[in-house]
Structure formats: C-alpha cells, structure tokens
Amino acid sequence: IRLGLVGSEMCIRDRCNGCQVLSELKEIIPGTEGWPCLKRNISNQFEARLVQLKVNNSKSIFFHNMEDSQLVVPVAHGEGRMEFSDSSHLEKLFLNNQIPLQYVDSKGDIATSYPSNPNGTTDGISSVCSSDGKVTILMPHPERAFLNRQLSWTNNEDQGFSPWFEMFINARKFVN
C-alpha cells in the first residue's frame, strides 16, 4: 500500500502530533525511507518553550529561500526525539538534503545536548522531508510564531509577519 494523497500539486507539512503520526505511516508514504520513529524526550519531561533552529538547504518545498536562517520557534512535546533505526539511514537523509531543520545553540552551532536540543535527537534534527520534498514533518511549532506579535520579545504593536511566514508562502507558491 502506498499513500496516494501526495499528488503532483499537493504537499503535506505536519508538526508535533501530526509529525508523530506521519512518522508511523512512513511505510506507505513515497520517498520516506529511513525516516525516524518518535520517542520520549531524553529529559523525560514535556518541553514547552522557545528554541533556536537552523534552516538547512533541503528538498522541502516549505523552506525554499530560508536556507541558513537561524530562527526562534516554540516547542511543546514530550515525545519528540527522532530515533533512526540505522545510522546509514541518517547519513542518507543528510546526503539527500532531507534534513530541513536542526536545533542550534546560542552560538549557532548544532545543538547536540539539552537544553538547546530539547528532546535529545541525534545531530539536533527537528525535521525530515520526503525525497521529493513534498512531505515534511517537524516537531517545533512555527505556526505559533508566524506573526511578530506572537513572539514575546518583539513590539506587540508590530502587525507584520515573522520570517516563519515564508514557510506558508512557499506552500502557497507550490500549489499555485
């Protein structure tokens, strides 16, 4: 059985619980070989706070023109650690540009430990995408940070969009 929902003009981006569900459905989603399973955070706690992410050059249609950005985003999960069944799967995902987002520390280095890496995922990975870039799963919540006023350190009167809004623009461009 293969999931036929992802047609030539359709894309899927799911975060948090949707990320967990889609990672379990990887066997029926084309181009998701080597995707991880989601496991309990290393901290054994629900993590609900802000973290920093680096946007990588990837095949994900959602992050075009965002490469090398370092952005703050909320996380809210207890089971967000991406566990790969084989290190060769992880290597292949990196080689194929299927790792759109990674947690980084305050210096911009890949976060390999808590608290900058809120769940303990290898190499700070917070997102993977399908080989064609149409399906992307991620644990963080950029939908909670696409308006400047959603970010506590910004001027609440700033009615503009944050850099995360580009993700939604990219999806719109893809389907048009």
Task: Give, region by region, the residue ranges found by the protein language model.
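Single conserved hydrophobic/aromatic residue that forms the stacking wall/gate
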Residues: 1-7, 12
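Generic recognition of cysteine residues
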Residues: 11, 16-19, 37, 129
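Hydrophobic or amphipathic alpha-helical targeting/insertion segments
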Residues: 13-31
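Glycine-rich, phosphate-binding/catalytic loops in enzymes
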Residues: 29-32, 154-156
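Short acidic (Asp/Glu) patches
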Residues: 30-40
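Amide-donor transfer/coupling interface in amidating biosynthetic enzymes
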Residues: 38-176
